[in-house]
């Protein structure tokens, strides 16, 4: 699970209305495949604002190594969150719930088989898998899809090259 300071920054940032600046939106969409743009647009305004910042930091950190698939990975790493339909306060409850259950995959899977708010919490906690599935269906580069699936895993479980994963992770937890 993300560090407390990262979660606090994301929470307070999500309270600010609006998405990224128009220039950042235009830049972000220029980094995405046509099939990825609808996924980007389905993300919440705060998630898009956060993701644009992550991608800009990745671009600065990696320079020429920040290829289109790497920047798409930065922009779409949280795309699975949109499947839950939870707002800011629901996400807070989901994050706390995930911590309480130790992110037990069997409990999370059971929650996704229910209805209403509990199902949405389960979906939110599965956002890495759901995001990877969405990106796979969109025909995203394997690196982009893998990072969505792996961005909450320990480094020794990443399949993306370590230098790229470290830059993506550092930019997200900045």
Model-found features: residue ranges?
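Non-catalytic interface/linker regions that flank or bridge core catalytic/transmembrane domains
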Residues: 1-39, 152-158, 162, 174
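Divalent metal-dependent catalytic cores for phosphoryl transfer on phosphate-bearing substrates
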Residues: 37-50, 55-174
């Amino acid at each position: 699970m993300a560090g407390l300071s990262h979660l606090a920054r994301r929470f307070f940032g999500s309270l600010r209305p609006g998405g990224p600046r128009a220039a950042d939106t235009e830049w972000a969409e220029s980094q995405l495949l046509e099939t990825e743009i609808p996924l980007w647009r389905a993300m919440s305004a705060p998630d898009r604002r956060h993701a644009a910042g992550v991608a800009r930091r990745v671009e600065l950190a990696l320079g020429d190594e920040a290829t289109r698939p790497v920047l798409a990975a930065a922009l779409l790493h949280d795309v699975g969150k949109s499947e839950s339909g939870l707002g800011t306060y629901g996400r807070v409850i989901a994050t706390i719930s995930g911590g309480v259950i130790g992110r037990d995959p069997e409990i999370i899977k059971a929650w996704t088989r229910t209805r209403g708010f509990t199902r949405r919490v389960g979906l939110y906690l599965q956002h890495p898998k759901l995001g990877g599935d969405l990106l796979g269906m969109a025909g995203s580069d394997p690196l982009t899809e893998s990072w969505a699936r792996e961005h909450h895993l320990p480094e020794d479980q990443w399949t993306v090259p370590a230098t790229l994963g470290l830059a993506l992770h550092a930019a997200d937890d900045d």
